[in-house]
Each structure stands twice: as C-alpha cells, then as structure tokens.
C-alpha cells in the first residue's frame, strides 16, 4: 500500500497555507483546505488505486472557485484524475461559508512509486 499523505499535503500547501487532514471541530480560519484518503486498494501485483477527497472552504464563492482551480491544476499536474466535484449551486453552506469537495483518483505503479497519468 502506497502512503501519499505527506506528498498530497505538501502539494496543497502550495495552494493555501491552511491545510488539514480533516476539518477541525469548532471555528476555523478560512480559507481552509482539508484532504482525506478515501480508498487505497491493490489493483494487481504492480498497481494500487488511490482516491482522495479534497474539501475547499472559503468566505466567498469567488475565493472558493479560485482555490478549487488551483487545487485542480496541482492534482491533475501530479497525474490524478478528477472524478467528482460539488455543484456550484450546492457550495453555499452558511453565512459567509462556501465549500466545494473534489474527488480524485489515480493508479500508482508500486515498483516506481509513480502515478500512471490519465488513469482512473
């Protein structure tokens, strides 16, 4: 099983200074990016499939969209494929609080510890 938590965290820190493994309880400082590994399963002897969920929280719709676009650029640049995203009309979750969740998937070559680009 491949553990890519630290690599994903370092990648997301290039987008936002406030990155956590999961959303903390109580009041939080925004913007905030949270990430969690949703699945990490072997495909066969040579490959694992990893799935991530990235949650982006911000004060305004424009800010959440800008952060989502930056996350998308970084994750797809690493070779992950976006498999789902929160629709725009469901992103306003409270007074001055916007949330978009983005799901990513990738096939990982275990021998070389690399992402197989374009795989889902």
Predicted regions and their residues:
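Short glycine-rich, basic-tinged beta-strand/loop micro-motifs
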Residues: 45-59
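Short, charged interaction patches at domain edges and termini
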Residues: 1-10, 26, 38-49, 86-120
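Short beta-strand elements
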Residues: 19-23, 81-88
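A common structural junction motif
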Residues: 72-80
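A broad, low-specificity signal marking well-ordered, structured residues that form hydrophobic/aromatic
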Residues: 33, 52, 102
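Small/polar-rich, solvent-exposed N-terminal microdomains that initiate assembly or binding
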Residues: 1-44, 62, 66-73
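Short hydrophobic/aromatic beta-strand micro-patches
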Residues: 36, 55-57, 107
């Amino acid at each position: 099983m491949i553990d890519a938590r630290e690599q994903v965290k370092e990648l997301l820190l290039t987008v936002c200074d406030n990155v956590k493994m999961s959303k903390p309880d109580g009041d939080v400082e925004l913007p905030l990016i949270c990430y969690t590994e949703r699945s990490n399963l072997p495909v066969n002897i040579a490959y694992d499939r990893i799935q991530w969920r990235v949650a982006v929280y911000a004060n305004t719709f424009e800010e959440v969209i800008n952060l989502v676009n930056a996350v998308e650029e970084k994750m797809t640049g690493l070779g992950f494929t976006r498999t789902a995203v929160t629709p725009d009309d469901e992103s306003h979750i409270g007074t001055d609080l916007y949330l978009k969740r983005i799901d990513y998937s990738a096939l990982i070559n275990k021998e070389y510890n690399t992402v197989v680009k374009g795989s889902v």
